[in-house]
Amino acid sequence: MILDMFRLDDKVAVITGGGRGLGAAIALAFAQAGADVLIASRTSSELDAVAEQIRAAGRRAHTVAADLAHPEVTAQLAGQAVGAFGKLDIVVNNVGGTMPNTLLSTSTKDLADAFAFNVGTAHALTVAAVPLMLEHSGGGSVINISSTMGRLAARGFAAYGTAKAALAHYTRLAALDLCPRVRVNAIAPGSILTSALEVVAANDELRAPMEQATPLRRLGDPVDIAAAAVYLASPAGSFLTGKTLEVDGGLTFPNLDLPIPDL
């Protein structure tokens, strides 16, 4: 049956930034598809709430509260997953982000910090996870969460957009290095209604122009990204590697225009 190809029965996944937003949605979707999940983020209470939902779906959950802005901390999650569940099949590098700023106010340290948070953490966990995937499962799948800002240009996103563009290309490079036993793909979300857009969601004057600028005339839901992640992690996506799925409502130009004046 075709739907069976989207199952993740008895797989083990690590998801960074799994306490809320996209990470929480992906964790719950993986559990509903049959996977056990290690979720990691900074806030224990958020992790506990997501873990409760995973267990309610009939799967095991393990939580790690840590500051994942540091690659050396993120790298430890792979071994913790094997310690908790006995193996590791899937990694979702979801943690990341950088606050918008004008180009002339963006320092070289800001660029380096954005790269470390968005690319360095993904690389550290991937390098730690792959040997364990090979040892315990014979292979696996890595999914990196990039962004449309890694493809489109908008004012205020020099550091963030550059880092997410690097993550998308890192995905292509890692896929070639790790084939054929480990697949590496990315998802580039558009404007998704998470806490990062809570101000937009509550204000029709802000939300309506963003929806109008999106060809599908709506903003995304975290489940849109979760569904793409299930596809990439499951046998249904077994012939994809090195690709970035653009789950953005059809954007060809940014739908968020920060009030940054002309020079």
Swiss-Prot record:
Per the record, the coiled-coil ranges are none
- Identify the residues that bind NAD(+): 17-41, 164
User: What residues sit in the active site?
Assistant: 160 (proton acceptor)
GO CC annotations?
A: plasma membrane
Keyword set, alphabetical order:
Oxidoreductase
Keyword Oxidoreductase part of the UniProt annotation: yes
Under the heading InterPro entries, the entry gives: NAD(P)-bd_dom_sf, Sc_DH/Rdtase_CS, SDR_fam
Q: Which residues bind substrate?
A: 147
EC numbers listed for it are 1.-.-.-
Xref: Pfam families: adh_short_C2 (PF13561)
What Gene Ontology terms describe what this protein does at the molecular function level? oxidoreductase activity
Q: Which GO terms describe its biological process?
A: symbiont-mediated perturbation of host innate immune response
Q: Which family does it belong to?
A: Belongs to the short-chain dehydrogenases/reductases (SDR) family.
Name of the protein described by the UniProt record:
Uncharacterized oxidoreductase Rv0927c
Q: Which organism is it from?
A: Mycobacterium tuberculosis (strain ATCC 25618 / H37Rv)
